[in-house]
A protein has these predicted regions:
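Short helix-capping segments at alpha-helix termini
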Residues: 61, 138-141, 248-249
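Fold-independent oxyanion-binding glycine-rich loops
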Residues: 70-71, 88-90, 110, 118, ...
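Short, surface-exposed alpha-helical segments at coil->helix boundaries
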Residues: 48-52, 125, 238
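N-terminal helical capping/dimerization or prosegment-like subdomains
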Residues: 2-87, 93-95
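Short coil/turn connectors at secondary-structure junctions
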Residues: 80-85, 109-110, 142-146, 169-173, ...
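Active-site metal-coordination/substrate-binding segment of hydrolases
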Residues: 83-150, 156
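Midchain, well-structured core segments that form catalytic/ion-binding scaffolds
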Residues: 155, 161-249
């Protein structure tokens, strides 16, 4: 039987899917938004708790683990030379508003999982971990080790990975299960500009925008935004809002 056929047969067992869903829920249920640093918890208690839970899961599945001062954790497939790094992360961006379910209590509805981190990146981390388990369980021949690296600061700049690679060498190969399948190339860099201006004093013409705010953080598309506009009547503002909505969808 070819390796692909072996893997497909392995995952055809409904128990595998239940194991996958249960492991994802276990991590999603830990609120791992970055917080103030504490001793032994460089990114606050949330990411540290998620890392503890993930490493416990790895050990329960029979993998050897390491903890780099709660910046990152590791799970190794075997004891051979490491030639593949799988880069995942356990931290999440704040949940924002508009949820119809508890973002930190993973639920399944109509075959879809809902919870903070299901797709970015706790779900993919668990998929990678159980893929490693499948390779091991099936006894597929490998000439090198695959190492799962569990980060805790990806959403705020990846200082966790920088900490790890300041102490350990890069692998010849690496990928991150943090996007769509198949392999894609995204996020070559980030640009976070700040804009400011000064105007000479002038009569305050109306209508004018007095304030504008929106969004949770720099790396998240704002779910909503607000503007304070002075000197405009409500019917006129409603008309403008409808026109913008029709134009932008």
């Amino acid at each position: 039987m070819k390796h692909q056929e072996q893997i497909e047969a392995y995952w055809s067992d409904p128990a595998r899917e239940r194991e996958l869903v249960g492991a994802i829920a276990r991590l999603v249920n830990v609120k791992s938004v970055k917080g103030d640093p504490e001793p032994g918890k460089p990114f606050g208690p949330g990411p540290a708790a998620a890392l503890d839970e993930a490493l416990a899961l790895c050990r329960e599945l029979g993998f050897s683990t390491s903890d780099y001062d709660h910046y990152v954790g590791l799970a190794d497939l075997n004891d051979k030379e490491t030639r593949l790094h799988i880069l995942g992360h356990l931290d999440v961006v704040g949940e924002g508003s508009g949820w119809s379910t508890d973002p930190y209590a993973c639920v399944e509805q109509d075959g879809v999982l809902y919870g903070r981190g299901v797709s970015d990146d706790k779900g993919p981390v668990v998929c990678a971990l159980l893929a490693m388990k499948a390779v091991r369980d099936l006894g597929l021949p490998l000439s090198a080790n695959a190492r799962l690296i569990l980060g805790t600061d990806e959403e705020s700049g990846s200082s966790d990975i920088a900490y790890y690679y300041a102490r350990e060498p890069y692998a010849p190969y690496a990928f991150t299960p943090d996007a769509d399948f198949p392999v894609i190339h995204i996020e070559k860099g980030h640009y976070h500009p700040g804009f400011g201006a000064e105007w000479a004093s002038a009569p305050a013409a109306l209508p004018r925008v007095a304030a504008l705010t929106g969004g949770l953080r720099q790396n998240v598309v704002p779910p909503e935004a607000e503007a304070m506009v002075l000197g405009i009547f409500a019917p006129d503002a409603e008309l403008v809002c409808r026109q913008v909505s029709e134009r932008t969808g």
